[in-house]
Design a protein with these regions (language model features):
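Phosphate/diphosphate ligand-binding glycine-rich loop within oxidoreductases
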Residues: 1-41
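Rossmann-fold NAD(P)-binding glycine/threonine-rich loop
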Residues: 19, 31, 134-183, 187-189
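Short helix-loop-beta connector
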Residues: 20, 43-49, 70, 130-131
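Glycine-rich adenosine-cofactor-binding loop
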Residues: 28, 47-67, 78-79
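Conserved S-adenosyl-L-methionine
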Residues: 68-73, 153-157
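NAD(P)-binding Rossmann-fold cofactor-contacting core
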Residues: 69-91
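Rossmann-like adenosine-cofactor binding region
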Residues: 93-159
Length: 195
């Protein structure tokens, strides 16, 4: 017998399984890891205009919690329009729409596409970037991802997915062992490795 969390069921993904007595519980900690990382970086979502590039599993895993933080609007761009439209249709009451608004000024730009990992990142031409724009790449690697390299041309507020990875793992650890692990040292070590 098992139980699946509302979040894991909604996003159709599981990354953590716990067992109590004879029952299994299936959960996804990716969204929590993402939101915890934003909180740790003092990035507030409420009332913000957000552009997300990509519509794959990583984006799906964060949207469930992202929309509940009451952004003003979320636009999703993807190479495969149908995939992005399907994702948008999951959130009919949360101002999540396909496409990029003409001359849109976004407070936060999130990259969830694999295009941000190899080669160069080609941003949508319609967006307006200011020195206050925050950039977040759900990808991570040793060194800077192409998305982060591009974003650093405009802003100092550029973040990769390392914090999300570590925070979602910490959440899984807490579910398994009932203990909040200390992650500061892990984050410092990973940052040092990627420089």
């Amino acid at each position: 017998e098992g139980e699946i969390s509302e979040e894991a069921k909604f996003i159709n993904a599981v990354n953590t399984i716990t067992k109590s007595n004879r029952n299994f519980k299936l959960e996804s900690t990716d969204g929590m890891g993402f939101m915890t990382d934003l909180k740790n970086k003092e990035i507030d979502i409420a009332g913000k205009n957000i552009l997300i590039v990509g519509a794959g599993a990583a984006v799906e895993s964060i949207l469930f919690r992202l929309v509940r933080s009451e952004p003003s609007k979320i636009n999703i761009l993807n190479r495969t329009k149908e995939k992005a439209l399907r994702l948008c249709s999951n959130y009919p009451n949360h101002n999540v729409e396909y496409g990029c608004q003409e001359d849109a000024e976004y407070d936060i730009i999130i990259n969830g596409s694999s295009a941000g990992l190899t080669g160069s990142f080609n941003p949508p031409k319609e967006i307006i970037i200011t020195n206050k724009t925050i950039f977040y790449d759900l990808n991570y690697s040793l060194g800077k991802t192409p998305f982060c390299e591009w974003a650093l041309e405009f802003s100092k507020s550029v973040h990769d997915g390392t914090g999300m990875l570590v925070n979602q793992a910490a959440q899984s650890f807490k579910l398994w062992f009932g203990v909040n692990p200390q992650i500061d040292r892990v984050l410092e070590d990973l940052k040092r490795l990627s420089e």
